[in-house]
């Protein structure tokens, strides 16, 4: 290990957060025939978010092999953030069937009202000096103030047809359509045509093949509108009325193959995809907070391969093995950077089966091995957020015993007649006690050098459980 450091920190302070959300929905459907209907759908939600904290940390940073002291300091984070949002939605849905076709159409109107008032600042001190250190004035390492309101109307509609037909090649399912949307806040109108086709080959009905392509848009919501300019640690926030929806052109090719092995059903699924991305609104991740740039300033792509094998060892429960490969990058100011979601590989296993000769004892095994995500110091440019966390590795093992087996409904009296199964189990989560990293705490010394100190996820845990299936 090179350049090892020792780090000690003490925290104090308090955080009080408040999140309250109300949902409501209403639907009225008129059936003209068994195959045709018209539906009116109304929905609304309202949310209030209060984020309030004052957190102080005092730390010591030393060389691991000696007594040289690199940093002794304090940092304090302060926030008083308030957000209130109300969204009302009204829509019409129509569906009918005729001669192998299923026709669907819809219209939608959405009203949004959002108000934000946010104040944040962060102070860092090292060796008795406030960072950044300037001899003629006192400055904070970071501060932000935002007071904004948004009110807008979104109109959208779609038309789609699904056509099932047979030929010498097999049974086809062709789905094609178009979606239109308009937002009066930024005066943007988008048109999104899409098409997909599936084939069940006549030569081998164990296979299902499919291909899909189309234009997909991600309309911006409030967080994506916040154009944050950071100059000397001072963040200025204004809402970008010229923001556009992020666009993706999808090409997806896939297939399923079903078969039997060891007298059990299996299914193998493969999917290859490429997505051309444009009008990207870059973002960074600070712990669990997503911060958008608020500008369409990048293009990019995502390409990958997903493989998955399903098997049913316990009736009604799938076991599976999946392998995923992916690369996604974005181009900002002529430089290609990995996107925050760039997880290059992911291998996972879920296996459950009864003990040999028994239907009462059951074991469950979970394995996960995944690439770490890109990261970097908070409040920095995207070009500095290309470090990559170590791979995530985890093993879970569980054993269950069936106390009651009433799947044949032989219990006909009392509470037992309502119970299908009753299980008693024990699980070992993170069986090997691997120290996986959740996030990083950044420490700055007097030379303004930053060090990433890992925050680890929970180690090994033993869990006891009791469950009843009705």
Kindly label every feature range from the protein language model.
Residues 2-6, 202-251, 265, 272-292, ...:
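Surface-exposed extracellular loop regions of Gram-negative outer-membrane beta-barrel proteins
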Residues 18-22, 84-88, 151-155, 189-191, ...:
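Residues that define the transmembrane beta-barrel architecture of outer-membrane proteins
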Residues 18-186, 269-272, 320:
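Face-selective signature of the C-terminal outer-membrane beta-barrel domain
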Residues 31-37, 97-102, 165-172, 202-207, ...:
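Short loop/turn motifs that connect adjacent beta-strands in outer-membrane beta-barrel proteins
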Residues 37-53, 242-301, 424-429:
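Membrane-embedded beta-barrel scaffold of Gram-negative outer-membrane proteins
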Residues 44-48, 98, 109-115, 155, ...:
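Transmembrane beta-strands of outer-membrane beta-barrel pores
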Residues 165-169, 273-276, 295-377:
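Gram-negative outer-membrane beta-barrel transporters
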Residues 369-378, 401-470:
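C-terminal beta-signal and adjacent terminal beta-strands/loops
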